A protein has these predicted regions:
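Short, positively charged and aromatic/hydrophobic N-terminal segments
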Residues: 4, 13, 17-28
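NAD(P)+-binding Rossmann beta1-loop-alpha1 motif at the extreme N-terminus of oxidoreductases
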Residues: 25-97, 122, 190
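Rossmann-fold NAD(P) dinucleotide-binding segment
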Residues: 84-148
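Interdomain hinge/lid region at the active-site interface
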Residues: 202, 211, 246-310
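NAD(P)-dependent dehydrogenase/reductase Rossmann-like domain
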Residues: 300, 304-332
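Active-site-proximal catalytic alpha-helix in oxidoreductases
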Residues: 163-164, 168-171, 192, 198-229, ...
Length: 332
């Protein structure tokens, strides 16, 4: 069973069942509007989250390794912090929006990490894509410090994060949800409550990443075949996006290829990592994932060819014998 929470409201009572899924009916808790919330990591997703929380009335403290980004956020009404520890000293809830388990470890437990500065009973909402086993272990470690943890990976891209409309896949104890509700409502459009055990949110996220990675790889392969066969790339995109072969990733990523714009919104190396987590999880259960393994190899090949920091659509560059679209010159 899971519970879907609606955005911009805090959870109250249960009001109905939809297809066997219990749906929480939520009401705005205006007393939470002045709560201090910290956001660690102002990348494509983190900056959108911080801005959404600011619009929702929270006092948002933020830190990032890039001081220019935090200064920009401060000019918009946020509070720039020099380190996770400085941020934690001022906040009751921290949202970590970093890339992986290693960065999560650093911002929480490293030099000037948040954990040592947090008051007992504070909440950490972890949004990184990590191994489910890491999420379980992290929950136990934070509990030993008297802290609450919500395993809460995210999806939807930078645009949905900026609009406060992203999807969150969450799991954790009731006390964590009680502390998190207003913050979740301020930063997400859909919050799926998957259980009271840490790691369930991360399991669902890596399954999502399995599909996302395979879809991007398949989209690149389809476009590469079209180019090889002399099909006009723009025409191919138009037809597929109005046909049964379309996917969200095809529709979203192929325009990057058509514009020859590989500015990373999500990089090739992200899928090297995420599909690696998928395969590690399946390997521990001795479960075969042939499509995931092939897609992972494609992203690995793109990364080893020097495209790791480019947009994940750059996986198309591994295909030989094709001429990719070039950047179009602006009209005079």
């Amino acid at each position: 069973m899971f519970v879907k929470l609606k955005k911009h409201f805090t959870r109250s009572d249960h009001r109905g069942m939809i297809g066997g899924i219990r749906l929480h009916t939520l009401t705005r808790n205006t007393s939470m509007n002045n709560k201090n919330v910290g956001v660690v990591g102002l990348g494509a997703m983190g900056l959108g989250i911080a801005r959404s929380l600011l619009r929702s009335g929270f006092n948002v403290h933020a830190c990032d390794v890039r001081s220019a980004v935090t200064e920009q956020f401060a000019s918009e009404g946020g509070v720039a912090c020099a380190s996770p520890a400085t941020l934690a000293a001022a906040c009751d809830v921290i949202v970590t929006v970093v890339v992986n388990a290693e960065q999560t470890e650093t911002v929480l437990f490293g030099d000037n990490g948040a954990v040592a500065a947090l008051r007992p009973g504070s909440l950490i909402i972890g949004c990184a894509t990590v191994a489910p086993t890491f999420a379980v272990d992290l929950g136990e470690r934070l509990a030993s410090h008297g802290l609450l943890y919500l395993d809460a990976p995210i999806s939807g891209g930078a645009a949905k994060a900026a609009a406060g409309e992203m999807t969150m896949m969450t799991s954790g104890p009731q006390a964590a949800y009680a502390a998190a509700d207003a913050v979740l409502a301020g930063m997400a459009g859909k919050v799926y409550r998957l259980g009271d055990v840490h790691g369930l949110g991360s399991k669902v996220k890596i399954i999502n990443q399995l599909l996302a990675g395979v879809h991007i790889a398949a989209s690149a392969e389809a476009m590469a075949l079209g180019l090889r066969e002399g099909v006009d790339a723009d025409a191919l995109y138009e037809v597929i996006t109005h046909s049964a072969g379309n996917s969200w990733m095809f529709e979203n990523r192929v325009p990057h290829i058509l514009k020859a714009d590989y500015t990373p919104l999500s990089a090739v190396d992200i899928f090297v990592k995420d599909l690696g987590l998928v395969l590690d999880t399946a390997r521990a259960s001795k479960f075969p994932l042939p499509l995931s393994a092939t897609a992972h190899q494609m992203f690995m090949q793109a990364s080893s060819a020097g495209f790791g920091r480019e947009d994940d659509s750059a996986v198309i560059k591994i295909f030989p014998g094709i001429e990719l679209p070039t950047a179009k010159k602006p009209s005079a």
